[in-house]
Amino acid sequence: MLNQQQTYKLLERFLHYTTYDTQSKSGAKISPSSAGQLKLAKHLQQELFALGLQDIDISKHSVVTAFLPSNVNPHSPTIGFIAHLDTATQCSGKNVQAEVIENYRGGDIALGVGEEFISPAHYQFLHQLIGKTLVVADGNTLLGADNKAGIAEIMTALAVLKEENLPHCNIRVAFTPDEEIGLGMQFFPVEKFPCDWAYTIDGGEVGELEYENFNAATAIVTIEGVNMHTGSAKDKMINALTLACEFQQGFPAEETPEQTEGKQGFYHLSHFTGHVEKVELQYLIRDFDRDGFEQRKIFIQQLVDRFNQQKRLKKPITLEIKDSYKNMNEVVKTVPQSVELADSAMRECGIEPIHKAIRGGTDGAWLAEQGLACPNVFTGGYNFHSKHELITLEGMQSAVNVITTIVRLATS
């Protein structure tokens, strides 16, 4: 358990990290996509030096890696802990003004001096947070708990291990850029992160342990038409916009993000751009089951084939499908101790594990493709990617306790 000074330092770290504008930029081709991520990476490098870690490195893409050898047994497992530097693209991360609310008494939470507020009427989980210390933003930005809380929790765990000389296995840490736009792991130096397994500290409520995620792909459908003066268009114009609308109607209406939950997969029309002469449709394909995932890709191909056979077209509709990431569970289940140890650590800390499937992806999914099992552990935060984002100090304390317990249990 953290003492008062360690808890204060945990909060101080987190609040300081939120002052860095690390919002990633959609459409970026290089990483890091924002200068603030490199600034935060350099700050973390200095903290790691002060904590006495070894092999500290910042890559040219702002990936920070470091190593803490075991103080018990050099042959103990090597466990990695990962968090990402960037914040989400959907909401500004500039000039974050965090506010600490001690002993939350329930009811609405006003954010700054504007009209934004967080209400238990919309967020039922607030009823469970009465009496806790909350951290929120001022209603103009997100808070950045996703994932600066994870960074603060990892750094604080390292500090506690050093201060108290607690027994621990070999530890590697990594802080990565551009997780929110899917670029960070493209430049991850796997050779500098040799682990038996790892954890991303990027989950939500206390107790969350996630080791399943969607299989994911992106499909791009291109439809070309023929423009013509509308007064003489009969039997000549081919309106790509009209064809695109009809194409979209070929998908099952009940298999969209807004109609699905749990382990149900979906098709998501994420972009619709163009004009009469040319339209591009971009779809996200998601499914937990590998066979179901492949069937979804076949479905889109069959829909394209049917249109090409039945419709009057300028040229055949084209389809490009690119896999994004796979369900990490295929790898995690080959390293069952990665889940078992986290479960045991949580229970020792008085937390009942909540096994959830991620309706999305994590850096751990990419690492799983490289053969490294990497479940996702809670941070204690809520409402990520939103002006209503918040986190509890108690939840952050719990995450630190779980990390230090995992590395202690691994020594035995």
Swiss-Prot record:
<dbReference type="InterPro" id="IPR036264">
    <property type="entry name" value="Bact_exopeptidase_dim_dom"/>
</dbReference>
<dbReference type="GO" id="GO:0006508">
    <property type="term" value="P:proteolysis"/>
</dbReference>
<feature type="binding site">
    <location>
        <position position="385"/>
    </location>
    <ligand>
        <name>Zn(2+) 2</name>
    </ligand>
</feature>
<keyword id="KW-0479">Metal-binding</keyword>
<feature type="active site">
    <location>
        <position position="86"/>
    </location>
</feature>
<dbReference type="Pfam" id="PF01546">
    <property type="entry name" value="Peptidase_M20"/>
</dbReference>
<feature type="binding site">
    <location>
        <position position="84"/>
    </location>
    <ligand>
        <name>Zn(2+) 1</name>
    </ligand>
</feature>
<dbReference type="Pfam" id="PF07687">
    <property type="entry name" value="M20_dimer"/>
</dbReference>
<comment type="function">
    <text>Cleaves the N-terminal amino acid of tripeptides.</text>
</comment>
<keyword id="KW-0963">Cytoplasm</keyword>
<keyword id="KW-0862">Zinc</keyword>
<protein>
    <recommendedName>
        <fullName>Peptidase T</fullName>
        <ecNumber>3.4.11.4</ecNumber>
    </recommendedName>
</protein>
<keyword id="KW-0378">Hydrolase</keyword>
<keyword id="KW-0645">Protease</keyword>
<feature type="binding site">
    <location>
        <position position="180"/>
    </location>
    <ligand>
        <name>Zn(2+) 2</name>
    </ligand>
</feature>
<feature type="binding site">
    <location>
        <position position="146"/>
    </location>
    <ligand>
        <name>Zn(2+) 1</name>
    </ligand>
</feature>
<comment type="similarity">
    <text>Belongs to the peptidase M20B family.</text>
</comment>
<dbReference type="GO" id="GO:0008270">
    <property type="term" value="F:zinc ion binding"/>
</dbReference>
<keyword id="KW-0482">Metalloprotease</keyword>
<dbReference type="GO" id="GO:0045148">
    <property type="term" value="F:tripeptide aminopeptidase activity"/>
</dbReference>
<dbReference type="InterPro" id="IPR002933">
    <property type="entry name" value="Peptidase_M20"/>
</dbReference>
<keyword id="KW-0031">Aminopeptidase</keyword>
<feature type="binding site">
    <location>
        <position position="146"/>
    </location>
    <ligand>
        <name>Zn(2+) 2</name>
    </ligand>
</feature>
<feature type="binding site">
    <location>
        <position position="202"/>
    </location>
    <ligand>
        <name>Zn(2+) 1</name>
    </ligand>
</feature>
<dbReference type="GO" id="GO:0008237">
    <property type="term" value="F:metallopeptidase activity"/>
</dbReference>
<dbReference type="InterPro" id="IPR001261">
    <property type="entry name" value="ArgE/DapE_CS"/>
</dbReference>
<dbReference type="GO" id="GO:0005829">
    <property type="term" value="C:cytosol"/>
</dbReference>
<dbReference type="GO" id="GO:0043171">
    <property type="term" value="P:peptide catabolic process"/>
</dbReference>
<feature type="active site" description="Proton acceptor">
    <location>
        <position position="179"/>
    </location>
</feature>
<dbReference type="InterPro" id="IPR011650">
    <property type="entry name" value="Peptidase_M20_dimer"/>
</dbReference>
<dbReference type="InterPro" id="IPR010161">
    <property type="entry name" value="Peptidase_M20B"/>
</dbReference>
